[in-house]
């Protein structure tokens, strides 16, 4: 145990309700520190599109939502020490919020329960607000780029050949994370976004930018890559995005990875392309209790990959080699989380990562 008052076992949190949505609760349970579980006093949280999409059958009444948080460890279970986590550590993580199997664990709470193996330590030079915006993006991109797409390089062991890799939706938070990781790994990021985001994505390392609204977008990418593009990461994942990615990939085919289930009808148009989609929580090594197609049993191999990749993210962060997406930081605590979700659903958020400060 740590400094958290033992008598206090309830807290304010954003939880699922009986209508398939979320609400602010002031009597949510505080997680218990046991085994490898630690309790973190949250200082900042970020709101991702996946949080906003958690509606309907994905909602468990009373379960705490949210994936990304940053804060200070206040309690530790007995097994936390083997992951070098102790009370007082500044940490951030991507966890599985709105989890029917661990309903008391979610980022959108005053005190967050998390498995110690999921935690990334925050360097002294990185703020809580910045740290809260890092883990979901960089963890998921690592899975997509270096496991699913099987890129022949790594940020700590760069490719000797600067192969082009398409990032569709480069102005998203996952997009700018992917661009940075590709550059570090020795690849050439070729990116789609709206023209008003060209300067943004080039500041993160994009080699070339293409307007996905342009009917000739795919043809322009094929020309840029000399009809030899072999890898595409789709950060948007809808029919249009997949069609452009498929049309941009070269004559020899290649690999396409999405961040949501992709349209099978588009996949059928070019069987020479290997399509896949990923979700970050598989790297936690836990059963996922969400409905199909997201629910699944724990995969030990993906957990091992996740632990290796988390160590890479920690090293890149310690060395100052990665940075967060541009932030829109809000005061007002957890009440702003629901506002941020609604803004994302209404497509009022562009080029910014929504971060909510929990302390003044």
Curated annotation (Swiss-Prot):
Its EC number is 1.-.-.-. It holds the Pfam family ADH_N. Substrate binds at residues 136-143, 280-284. Pathway: Mycotoxin biosynthesis. NADP(+) binds at residues 50-53, 171-174, 194-197, 212, 259-260, 349-350. Gene3D superfamilies: Medium-chain alcohol dehydrogenases, catalytic domain, NAD(P)-binding Rossmann-like Domain. InterPro entries: ADH-like_C (IPR013149), ADH-like_N (IPR013154), GroES-like_sf (IPR011032), NAD(P)-bd_dom_sf (IPR036291), PKS_ER (IPR020843), Trans-enoyl_RdTase-like (IPR047122). Keywords: NADP, Nucleotide-binding, Oxidoreductase. The keyword Membrane does not apply. SUPFAM superfamilies: GroES-like, NAD(P)-binding Rossmann-fold domains. Belongs to the zinc-containing alcohol dehydrogenase family. Monomer. This is Trans-enoyl reductase prlC. It comes from Fungal sp. (strain NRRL 50135).
């Amino acid at each position: 145990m740590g400094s958290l008052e033992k008598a206090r076992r309830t807290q304010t949190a954003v939880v699922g309700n009986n209508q398939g949505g979320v609400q602010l609760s002031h009597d949510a349970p505080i997680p218990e520190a046991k085994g490898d579980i630690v309790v973190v006093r949250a200082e900042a949280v970020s709101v991702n599109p996946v949080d906003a999409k958690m509606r309907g059958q994905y909602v468990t009444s009373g379960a705490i939502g949210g994936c990304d948080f940053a804060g200070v460890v206040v309690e530790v279970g007995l097994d936390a020490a083997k992951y070098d986590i102790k009370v007082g550590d500044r940490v951030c993580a991507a966890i599985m919020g709105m989890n029917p199997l661990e309903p008391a664990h979610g980022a959108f709470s005053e005190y967050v329960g998390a498995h110690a193996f999921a935690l990334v330590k925050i360097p002294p030079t990185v703020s809580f607000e910045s740290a809260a915006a890092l883990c979901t993006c960089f963890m998921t991109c690592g899975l997509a780029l270096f496991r699913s797409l099987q890129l022949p390089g790594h940020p700590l062991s760069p490719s000797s050949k600067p192969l082009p890799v398409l990032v569709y939706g480069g102005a998203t938070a996952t997009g700018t994370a992917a661009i940075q990781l590709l550059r570090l790994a020795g690849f050439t990021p070729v990116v789609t976004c709206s023209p008003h985001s060209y300067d943004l994505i080039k500041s993160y390392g994009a080699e070339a930018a293409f307007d996905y609204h342009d009917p000739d977008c795919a043809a322009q990418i094929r020309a840029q890559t000399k009809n030899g593009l072999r890898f595409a990461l789709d950060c948007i994942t809808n029919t249009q995005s997949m069609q452009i990615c498929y049309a941009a990939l070269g004559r020899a085919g290649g690999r396409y990875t999405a961040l949501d289930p992709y349209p099978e009808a588009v996949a059928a148009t070019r069987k020479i392309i290997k399509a896949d989609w990923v979700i970050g929580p598989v790297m936690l090594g836990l059963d996922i209790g969400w409905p199909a197609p997201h629910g699944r049993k724990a995969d030990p191999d993906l957990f091992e990959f996740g632990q290796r990749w988390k160590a890479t993210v920690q090293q890149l962060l310690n060395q100052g080699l990665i940075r967060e997406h541009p932030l829109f930081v809000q005061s007002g605590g957890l009440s702003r989380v629901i506002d941020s979700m609604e803004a994302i659903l209404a497509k009022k958020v562009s080029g910014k990562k929504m971060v909510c400060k929990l302390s003044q």
